[in-house]
């Protein structure tokens, strides 16, 4: 399965059966067969086996676990990577919406850094996610794709607002906004420059 539309995000954000603490986040995923298989696949990233990564399998495993088994921030990180690595504007925007939705729905509850004991670790993980997002955004190309550019920008604006509300590190998001603006489609950039000239 590949995420290509907003409707595909809904099962990922929906609650799961409650655990022993009454939190609707399903079961612990670590050490499950799917979790270990996903970890093994993503360990290839950045290694000599990078070109052998089965991104479709990794994405399917992550979707299945988050939708049907348990909410886990490490699995979320892998899924975000799957959505972002191609430089596809639509899927990149969906990755930002997914992260925003998770912050709203189950970020503070999810394994393995759930509850008060994970309060210091979750911001670090968020920073790791956003730093990688910034790095992968370099591959985006919005030439003749103004709709994709606007989708990414609007999604990022919502994520920035929510990150500020939750006091999460946002430096990479600010840099990402500057990078997106640099990648603004030419016709849109020319219009913005023209408006700026008229205003002066």
Question: Residue spans of the language-model regions?
Answer:
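N-terminal domain-start signal
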Residues: 1-114, 124, 198-200
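Mid-to-C-terminal functional-domain signal that highlights helix-capping/loop sites
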Residues: 110-200
């Amino acid at each position: 399965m590949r995420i290509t539309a907003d409707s595909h995000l809904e099962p990922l954000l929906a609650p799961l059966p409650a655990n022993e603490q009454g939190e609707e986040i399903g079961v612990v995923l670590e050490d499950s067969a799917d979790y270990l298989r996903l970890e093994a696949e993503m360990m290839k990233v950045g290694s000599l086996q990078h070109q052998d990564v089965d991104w479709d399998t990794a994405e399917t495993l992550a979707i299945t676990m988050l939708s049907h088994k348990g909410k886990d921030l490490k699995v979320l990180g892998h899924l975000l990577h799957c959505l972002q690595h191609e430089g596809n504007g639509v899927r990149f925007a969906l990755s930002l919406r997914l992260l925003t939705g998770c912050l709203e729905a189950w970020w503070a509850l999810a394994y393995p850094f759930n509850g008060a004991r994970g309060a210091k670790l979750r911001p670090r993980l968020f920073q790791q996610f956003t730093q990688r997002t910034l790095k992968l955004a370099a591959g985006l190309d919005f030439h003749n794709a103004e709709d994709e550019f606007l989708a990414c920008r609007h999604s990022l604006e919502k994520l920035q607002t929510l990150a500020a509300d939750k006091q999460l590190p946002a430096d990479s998001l600010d840099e990402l906004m500057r990078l997106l603006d640099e990648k603004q489609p030419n016709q849109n950039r020319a219009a913005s420059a023209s408006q700026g000239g008229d205003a002066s």
